[in-house]
Amino acid sequence: VIYKTNLDLVQNLVQSLERTKSKAHVILSSSSQEDRDNLYGKSKKEGRVLLANWAQKTDTTFTGMIIPNVFGPFGHPYYNSVVATFSHQIANGETPKIEVDGDLKLIYVGELVSEMVKAIENKTNDSCYSVKPTAEAKVSELLSLLQSYKKEYVDNGAIPSIHNTFELNLFNT
């Protein structure tokens, strides 16, 4: 379902762009999961390639952003990121479970928006634009920080110790 849905969306967009003879600068947010052996990653990569082909054929600016794990306010639990899921679970008294304690490459949503604005201002024409992560952490580190923020801030009414921009952004999530 997700494979077909993602590709249908891009195909409909390309058809609309062609029908209207649009020369709009299109920015696609793809995923660092493009290279994983799953239907989500495959659909994201194929969608990006479809738009890149349209842009090349029509001599139009296209930025295909390959984005690391995004976190920040308004993330949806069980959908956007493990940060949103853990935050939701902790806030609701649930016990988060770590499936795989892997290393995550992360970017805060505000930092991602800045990257997108830069791409627009610079008219970045790159079908495979790799957005650099601004932080890296193990899943267990994220969980530990989020749990400590809840304990210190919510339970005890104290501002937790924040040591860097990543921790500030995580706290603001």
Language-model features and meaning:
Residues 32-39, 70-74:
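Conserved catalytic-site region of short-chain dehydrogenase/reductase
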Residues 3-7, 37-48, 76-80, 106:
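Short-chain dehydrogenase/reductase
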Residues 46, 50-54, 86, 142:
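Hydrophobic alpha-helix immediately C-terminal to the catalytic Tyr-X-X-X-Lys motif of short-chain
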Residues 75-85, 99-121, 140-144:
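Substrate-positioning beta->alpha
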Residues 2-27, 45-52:
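NAD(P)-cofactor binding segment of oxidoreductase domains
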Residues 52-75, 88, 94-105:
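Conserved beta-loop-beta element that borders a ligand/cofactor-binding pocket
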Residues 118-173:
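Mid/C-terminal beta-alpha module of Rossmann-like enzyme folds, strongest
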Residues 26-32, 65-67:
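SDR active-site strand-loop-helix element
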